[in-house]
Curated annotation (Swiss-Prot):
The keyword Heme does not apply. Residues 146-195 form a coiled coil. Residues 52-122 are annotated as: Disordered. One of its GO terms (cellular component) is mediator complex. Pfam families: Med21 (PF11221). Component of the Mediator complex. Component of the Mediator complex, a coactivator involved in the regulated transcription of nearly all RNA polymerase II-dependent genes. Mediator functions as a bridge to convey information from gene-specific regulatory proteins to the basal RNA polymerase II transcription machinery. Mediator is recruited to promoters by direct interactions with regulatory proteins and serves as a scaffold for the assembly of a functional preinitiation complex with RNA polymerase II and the general transcription factors. PANTHER family: MEDIATOR OF RNA POLYMERASE II TRANSCRIPTION SUBUNIT 21, RNA POLYMERASE II HOLOENZYME COMPONENT SRB7. This is Mediator of RNA polymerase II transcription subunit 21. It comes from Aspergillus oryzae (strain ATCC 42149 / RIB 40) (Yellow koji mold). The gene is srb7. One of its GO terms (molecular function) is transcription coregulator activity. It comes from the Eukaryota. Keywords: Activator, Coiled coil, Nucleus, Transcription, Transcription regulation.
């Protein structure tokens, strides 16, 4: 039973780790599509523009100008090659040794979202792993002793085990008493054999 409980604890830890990894993937690689407001509901909140990952700027309505949807820090953190598309040297990254805009991307920016097909495939894979781990946990729980017994049956079984334990303890004590008696008899026999072989050494010494 102790081994089953150890396996169960390990599976629970692994399940928690899988949940954390799954949520981390969904948050990191989702496309962050804006919510779709309900139709024919004038009181519904307007749809929000796509929010950049790790953004600290407040969300803006989807119809707001592009400049109001990003903070100055976010605008300055854009890829330099994208800022020069209006000029003649588009694709050149300042301060990057004449490299392209893709090569000079800011490493602090979050990774690009996965394609819908890749994202859906990995979602299914992560969900399958969670289901398999949950089934392992259910199996370990099902093989625990007494899992299908009621509380009254478990109490009755505990009392029976207590009686068996007391009986085994009484039998052990009886065996210990018998062993002590046998040891005492054996010591007497060995003493008699020693006297028969060597005689009374004290009496022999006094005669001399």
């Amino acid at each position: 039973m102790a081994d089953i409980l150890t396996q169960l604890q390990t599976c629970l830890d692994q399940l928690a780790t899988q949940f954390y990894a799954t949520i981390g993937y969904l948050v990191t690689y989702h496309d962050n599509s804006p919510a779709i407001p309900p139709q024919n509901d004038p009181t519904a909140a307007p749809a929000l523009a796509k929010i950049t990952k790790n953004s600290t700027a407040p969300p803006a309505p989807a119809g707001a100008p592009a400049g109001s949807q990003a903070s100055p820090q976010q605008q300055s953190a854009q890829i330099p090659g994208q800022q020069q598309q209006g000029g003649g040297d588009a694709g050149q990254t300042p301060g990057a040794g004449g490299g392209t805009g893709g090569a000079g991307a800011d490493p602090n920016l979050p990774p690009a979202p996965d394609s819908p097909r890749t994202f859906a495939s990995r979602q299914r894979e992560l969900a399958r792993d969670l289901v398999i781990k949950e089934q392992q946990i259910e199996y370990l729980i099902s093989v625990l002793p007494g899992i299908d017994s009621s509380e009254a049956e478990q109490e009755r079984r505990i009392k029976e085990l207590e009686k068996e334990l007391r009986s085994a303890e009484e039998d052990r004590e009886q065996r210990v008493r018998e062993l002590r008696k046998l040891r005492k008899k054996l010591e007497n026999v060995l003493g008699a054999v020693e006297v028969g072989i060597y005689g009374d050494r004290g009496a022999v010494a006094s005669r001399r």
